[in-house]
């Protein structure tokens, strides 16, 4: 056997490519050209095809991705992967330091690290070889994503001899800004949905069943924790050991002796934030001593020895290219800013809300302006201000069009309201938006019916009203390009499931002006059946808590229209069953909740629905009548007001316990 085809040569080639991967992806100092690397990798693959029995678990070829798997198995974590509590002010930082020092009886050292906005994973090595990788999941169990994690070039598949035989590392999987932009450009070329931000892109990529597709996207990872045998007592030193063993650790963790030093480092990281190649939303502070960490322990959800300090939302300048006008389900015209795409708080922003014509005039926003864009609560893009010094000559004041941009009917400005409305009952845009709302998550929650499918159903003349959805057939749906029999059956199955709906959800789905889930719950709780809601008088409606004259008038007017009543009857004739409302005996019944910030693993809508299912009420502002304020990430001014009024504040763990979500 030739030397170059021996098993010894194969192993040497594996080690050589392993070294080149480390130089290129971790040190960012390539030692050979891409062509030379590809030739060596091609030789490795040839040897493995000829001698499959020689292939080792840590072969660089495993980074290319295995065959697609059918699904991900669920595996229990060796140790729970808990969350880290968030803080947003120096006062909360001070409280954390005081709490730690009081519990330990001394002032400990702290490690400060970047809080990368990615996807947490746990990676296990046996005999110094990567054998398993799990997603965080619910903290107790995660999905086995080993094949996808192997594709990360900066992650070692095998550890050096001075590393322990058995270890687990935990890290954050992410995309750099540059890679994220490339991925979205490819998504656009393929006419697929673009990702809102790098975190969503990373999460979606790890969910792909084809590791070969994952490998093409070039995920990255940063290690933030090591679980290993031995007597080392320093988290900071553990991170240094990880670096020595070839793991990527982003941002040079800092070891601090005092709280004052921690605060200084936090300021430094904030100034460096804009120059980082990846998205961070804060920094993580950890008690450095592992023994002290064990003493401090954890709550059911958070570690008591760590805190995430969140920075203020970012702002970005960009060009306002145009002001588009959208028509909503009730005919209201809404102006939307079309922006030159800009990366903001990890999201690629190309649209921003302008609310209404009065708001545009108040801020003097014009087409061609350079504007400053921010995210309200780091979620909804909005135009904060105009950079008037950059305004081009000849710019004009913008006014709402006099005609609907879709049906070209005259629009009207309603008395005492800022809204401009298309009142043409035949306007296709309003009808499509009404159906889109009807099937949406806050209403009947019918899967697989997006705006493109609904629009195509309209164009084909298959749907004109919400009731028409319940008489669609497989043959109807298969007329839409791209929908085959299996997809059609999935849509029909979702529609069939939606035929059994609670009264409050059905009232929301109807799209009655001014009626959201809060008012719908009040109506359902008082009248209990749809027939009684329909027959309610204006005076009866007005007597209910939280319903004023305008809302009562909107409800009465809606149900006095025979067109609406006929559509409801048609739905019932087609099998829609509206369940009567039954009051809950929950301890939350009648309690008033206000939510501030973003909840982890739970949308605002899910949280509000859970509260209402327990008989609670959801408010939009804090007052003396508020019983609980639920605090998520990035809470707003509602939190401070709750503290001043002495309202009970629930973190997410207390909230889920109260409403029995877990």
Swiss-Prot record:
Keyword Metal-binding on entry: yes
Cofactor section: Mg(2+); Mn(2+)
Keyword set, alphabetical order: DNA damage, DNA repair, DNA replication, Ligase, Magnesium, Manganese, Metal-binding, NAD, Zinc
Catalytic activity from the UniProt record: NAD(+) + (deoxyribonucleotide)n-3'-hydroxyl + 5'-phospho-(deoxyribonucleotide)m = (deoxyribonucleotide)n+m + AMP + beta-nicotinamide D-nucleotide
Leader sequence residues: none
Top-tier EC class: ligase
Annotated transmembrane regions: none
GO biological process: DNA repair; DNA replication
EC number: 6.5.1.2
HAMAP family the record matches: DNA_ligase_A
Family as reported in the entry's similarity comment: Belongs to the NAD-dependent DNA ligase family. LigA subfamily.
Name of the protein in question: DNA ligase
Native organism taxonomy: Bacteria, Pseudomonadati, Chlamydiota, Chlamydiia, Chlamydiales
Originating gene: ligA
């Amino acid at each position: 056997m030739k030397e170059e085809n021996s098993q010894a040569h194969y192993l040497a080639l594996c080690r050589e490519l392993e070294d080149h991967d480390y130089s290129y992806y971790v040190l960012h100092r390539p030692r050979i050209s891409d062509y030379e690397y590809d030739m060596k990798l091609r030789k490795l693959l040839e040897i493995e095809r000829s001698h499959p029995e020689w292939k080792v678990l840590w072969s660089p070829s495993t980074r290319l991705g295995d065959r697609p798997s059918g699904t991900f198995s669920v595996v229990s974590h060796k140790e729970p992967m808990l969350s880290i509590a968030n803080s947003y002010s120096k006062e909360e930082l001070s409280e954390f330091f005081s709490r730690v020092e009081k519990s330990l009886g001394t002032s400990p050292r702290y490690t400060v690290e970047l809080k990368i906005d990615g996807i947490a994973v746990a990676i296990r090595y046996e005999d110094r070889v990567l054998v398993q990788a799990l997603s965080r999941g619910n903290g107790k169990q995660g999905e086995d994503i080993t094949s996808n994690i192997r594709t990360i070039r900066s992650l070692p598949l095998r550890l050096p001899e001075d590393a322990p035989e058995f270890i687990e590392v935990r890290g954050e999987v992410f995309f750099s800004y540059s890679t994220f932009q490339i991925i979205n450009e490819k998504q656009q070329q393929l006419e697929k949905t673009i990702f809102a931000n790098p975190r969503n892109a990373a999460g979606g990529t790890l969910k792909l069943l084809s590791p070969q597709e994952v490998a093409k996207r070039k995920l990255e990872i940063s290690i933030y924790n090591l679980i290993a045998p031995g007597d080392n007592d320093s988290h900071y030193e553990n991170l240094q050991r990880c670096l020595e063993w070839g793991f990527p650790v982003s941002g040079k963790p800092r070891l601090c002796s005092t709280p004052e030093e921690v605060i200084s480092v936090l300021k430094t990281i904030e100034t460096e934030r804009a120059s980082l190649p990846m998205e961070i939303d804060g920094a993580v502070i950890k008690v450095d001593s592992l023994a002290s960490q064990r003493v401090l322990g954890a709550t059911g959800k958070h570690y008591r020895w760590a805190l995430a300090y969140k920075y203020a939302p970012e702002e970005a300048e960009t060009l306002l290219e145009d002001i588009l006008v959208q028509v909503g389900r009730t005919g209201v015209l809404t102006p939307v800013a079309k922006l030159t795409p800009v990366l903001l708080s990890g999201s690629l922003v190309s649209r921003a809300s302008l609310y209404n014509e009065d708001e545009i005039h108040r801020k003097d926003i014009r087409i061609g302006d350079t504007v400053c864009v921010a995210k309200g609560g780091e979620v909804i893009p909005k135009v904060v201000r105009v950079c008037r010094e950059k305004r081009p000559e000849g710019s004009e004041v913008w006014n709402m069009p006099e005609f609907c941009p879709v049906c070209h009917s005259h629009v009207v400005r309603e008395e005492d309201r800022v809204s401009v409305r298309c009142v043409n009952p035949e306007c296709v845009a309003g009808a499509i938006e009404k159906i889109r709302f009807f099937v949406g998550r806050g209403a009947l929650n019918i899967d697989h019916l997006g705006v493109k499918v609904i629009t195509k159903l309209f164009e084909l003349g298959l749907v004109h009203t919400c009731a028409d959805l319940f008489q669609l057939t497989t043959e109807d749906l298969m007329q839409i390009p791209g929908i085959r029999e299996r997809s059609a059956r999935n849509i029909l199955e979702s529609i069939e499931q939606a035929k059994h709906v609670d009264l409050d959800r059905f009232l929301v789905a109807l799209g009655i002006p001014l009626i959201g889930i809060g008012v719908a719950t009040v109506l359902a709780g008082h009248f209990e059946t749809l027939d009684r809601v329909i027959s309610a008088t204006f005076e009866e409606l007005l007597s209910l808590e939280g319903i004023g004259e305008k809302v009562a008038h909107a409800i009465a007017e809606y149900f006095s229209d025979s067109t609406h009543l006929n559509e409801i009857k048609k739905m019932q004739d087609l099998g829609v069953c509206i369940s009567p409302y039954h009051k809950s005996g929950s301890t939350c019944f009648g309690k008033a909740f206000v939510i501030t910030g973003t909840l982890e693993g739970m949308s605002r809508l899910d949280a509000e629905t859970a509260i209402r299912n327990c008989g609670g009420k959801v408010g939009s502002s804090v007052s003396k009548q508020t019983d609980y304020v639920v605090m998520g990430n990035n809470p707003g001014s509602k939190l401070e007001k709750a503290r001043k009024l002495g309202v009970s504040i629930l973190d997410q763990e207390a909230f889920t316990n109260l409403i029995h979500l877990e």
